[in-house]
Amino acid sequence: MRSKIYFTSDAHLGSRHHADPMTVERRLAAWLERIRHEAKAIYFMGDMFDYWFEYRYVVPRGFTRFLGKVAELSDEGVEIHFFAGNHDVWLTDYLTKELGAHVHMHGITVELSGKLFRLAHGDEEYRSVKRSYDCMYRLFRNPLARLLYAAVHPRWTVGLAYGISLKSRRSGEKRKTLGNIPHAYSNDYFDIENEWLIRFAKEHSARHPEVDFYIFGHRHLLVDMALRDEKRVLILGDWIRYNSYAVWDGTTLVLESMEDME
């Protein structure tokens, strides 16, 4: 019986940071196969792709196993949702037309089995924290900037995007080991009191006490934290280190990993 709702994020498919990108994709496809008979809906909460840009007639190569499995589940009646992350912000209508997916460019508040969820990738909430990121956020979502980018041949843009992503992640890992961690990447170095998504959830919950659960991706952290009055905030981890996801069965919301199923 299809009764469970799943949430996952940050697979970064195609990333050169993965020791073996194909292994990551196969693992993700295997997870989808395992949950196919129980899944009522699946929410992919951003950065499932390390880079994604849709031209009018062209999309990035690869991801065949993942997209094929998602298409199978959609055809079987599973509700599919994709959120734009900061790496795959340039989604348009491909996933909707080919997979029947609901695409969300911003966070949403939705009722699921009687509880109210605030769902977002997590990058949008950083705009109020750092002005430079707010400028970058606006630039990446600017229609003119997108039009100009689309005018450049993919031969140049795809390699450049993957290269910038890899450099950014390596730089973040280096800062982490020095104790300077604007991007935490790892629970081992995580300061929960200063995490902006935790602060956002606390502040938002004070203004919107009707929200029961907050679920984010983006930070590559595994977090399940209690707020006031039995409210909770979850950060989903990733498919780089944790192979993790959350599942809601209408009564219980838990963080799990692919290894828990083996």
Curated annotation (Swiss-Prot):
The protein's enzyme class: hydrolase
Biological process annotations from GO: lipid A biosynthetic process
Reported phenotype of the disruption mutant: Loss of viability.
Superkingdom, natural source: Bacteria
UniProt entry keywords in alphabetical sequence: Cell inner membrane, Cell membrane, Cytoplasm, Hydrolase, Manganese, Membrane, Metal-binding
Main localization (coarse): membrane
Reactions listed under catalytic activity: UDP-2-N,3-O-bis[(3R)-3-hydroxytetradecanoyl]-alpha-D-glucosamine + H2O = 2-N,3-O-bis[(3R)-3-hydroxytetradecanoyl]-alpha-D-glucosaminyl 1-phosphate + UMP + 2 H(+)
GO MF annotations in UniProt: metal ion binding; UDP-2,3-diacylglucosamine hydrolase activity
Co-factor binding comment: Binds 2 Mn(2+) ions per subunit in a binuclear metal center.
Cystine connections: none
Pfam families, per the entry: Metallophos
Function in brief: Hydrolyzes the pyrophosphate bond of UDP-2,3-diacylglucosamine to yield 2,3-diacylglucosamine 1-phosphate (lipid X) and UMP by catalyzing the attack of water at the alpha-P atom. Involved in the biosynthesis of lipid A, a phosphorylated glycolipid that anchors the lipopolysaccharide to the outer membrane of the cell.
Note: The grpE-dnaJ-PG1777-PG1778-PG1779 genes are co-transcribed and may form an operon.
Family, per entry: Belongs to the LpxH family.
The name this protein goes by in its record: UDP-2,3-diacylglucosamine hydrolase
